[in-house]
Amino acid sequence: MTQGGPLSYSCGLAGPALLGRTIDEVLSESATRFPQGEALVVCHQGVRLTYAEFQSRVSQTAKGLMAVGVRKGDRVGIWAFNCEEWVLTQFATAAIGAILVNINPAYGTRELAYALKQSGTHTLLFQSHFKHSNYPAMLEEICPEIAQCRQGRLRSRNLPHLRKLVFLGEGKKHDWLVWQDLNGLAQSISDESLAARQAELTFEDAINIQYTSGTTGFPKGVVLTHHNLVNNALFIGNSMNLSNRDRICIPVPFYHCFGRT
C-alpha cells in the first residue's frame, strides 16, 4: 500500500466468539461434565481412560515434571511415536506452562541436534527406537556426556540447555530417569503447588513448538499458544458437529500439525 492511498480491510463474520481459556481449563471442564466418559483409548498399549482418570494422570505427570525442575516457559521435548505418554505429556506441559517441543521420530542425528539446540530444550522424553533408529545411540553421538548422566541430570557442551533425560522404554543403558520415576517424584509436589503454577497461566502463553517439514532448508520452529489450539479444536468440532457421543480416531503422527492440533 502506498502512502496516502486507500486503506485495506478485511470484512467477515464476527462470530462465534473465540474462547479465552487454557487447555487445562478446558480439560477440567470436560472432566467435571463427563467424568465417566472415555477420554483416551490407546489400543496397542491396552489403555482406556475416562476423563476423570485422564485428568488425574495428567496432574500426576505435571507434578512429576515440576519435581525434576521444569519451570514455566521451559521447553520439554518428546521424541516418540504415538503413545499414552505422548498425550499425557502434551496436556501436562500445558498445565504447568511449559512448552512442548514435538520431535519427528524419523529424525537423524543432524536434525535431532538442530531441533534440541534451536528450541533450547530443557527436558527430553524419548523412546528406545523407531524402525532402524537407535535413539540412545543417536543421543550419545551428539551428546557424549550422557555416559556421565546421574539420575537424569545432564550437562552437555553441544546442548547447553538440555538438563534432564526421561526414558520411555525398558532396559535403560545409563542412569536416566524413566517414566515411572516421574510418577514417584510427583508425590513431592502438593496440589497447592500445582494450582499455584496453573494460576500463573494465560491463554496467550506459548505451549508448543512444531517443526516444519524443512523442504527448503532446516525445519523452522512454529510456536502455538493455548489460544491457537483451543480455538482450532472449537472450530473443527463445530464444523463436524461433534458431541460427547462421538469418537475420533487419530492414526496420523502426533508430532506434526494434523495429529497435534
Question: Across the structure, where does each feature detected by a protein language model lie?
Answer:
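A short helix-loop-beta submotif of the ANL/AMP-binding
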Residues: 62-63, 74-75, 81-101, 105-109, ...
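Conserved AMP-binding A3 loop
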Residues: 48-52, 198-231
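Conserved AMP-binding loop of ANL adenylate-forming enzymes
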Residues: 78, 239-261
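Glycine-rich helix-loop-beta junction characteristic of Rossmann-like nucleotide cofactor-binding loops
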Residues: 67-70, 238-242
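Conserved pre-ATP/AMP-binding loop-to-beta segment of ANL
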Residues: 35-38, 158-162, 166-167, 173, ...
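Structural core segment of the AMP-binding/adenylate-forming
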Residues: 68, 96-184
